[in-house]
């Protein structure tokens, strides 16, 4: 049975994300952006959404911890100590957002004891809120959703990240030869689209925890798997802007097995 504390936070998370969608749409394709030291883009909207969501949640849950790439205080890792924590990517797909490409999302994850238990993702392109977690089900807008069943076939669509690090070049060639690839420019949406049955699977070697934290519980709720290939990520012990890149596959069990087979060939 879900605790009242958890249910209160789930409802608050949905309200907090939806409260930022008007700003997200209004500034789409015209927000001023800058380049950070790590080579990633940030806009004033990223910062405003981070501040707005955490201000609202912090007022209701002051004992929780709040982690965002855009609002981190210094580069030192921050230990995860609270029962409840939040990991936010205010705009996943900032390059798309700044240039007027609609595949981008607000992605908010609720953690309990270091594990993601609920995700709330607003998909700008489809104007839909995707949300769910294990034991809570999964909604794509107002419709229940599931990971696609069955093995991969010639019409299957696989999400894949680019550019590709040279050390993954041989694997990338095999993936491109074996599957129909979709690269949307949003790691959150790649994984969330697996959860709701738009993509069959995803392979990614170049994400950090804030890129996927909100989508992982959606996949679990939708009956799928997220398999980490370079070490388990949960429970999250610390939030670190310099954490190593995560390498994972996701889909139903048969899809994950096939993707790993191609990677290991």
List where the protein language model places each region.
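Active-site-adjacent structural elements in enzyme catalytic cores
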Residues: 15, 59, 75-135, 139, ...
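Residue-level signal for inorganic ion chemistry
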Residues: 24, 46, 57, 94, ...
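Oxyanion/phosphate-interacting regions
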Residues: 1-10, 14-15, 173, 192-265
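Acidic beta-strand-loop-alpha-helix segment within the catalytic core
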Residues: 108-192, 238-265
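N-terminal subdomain of lithium-sensitive/metallo-dependent phosphomonoesterases centered on the IMPase/IPPase/PAP
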Residues: 1-91, 264
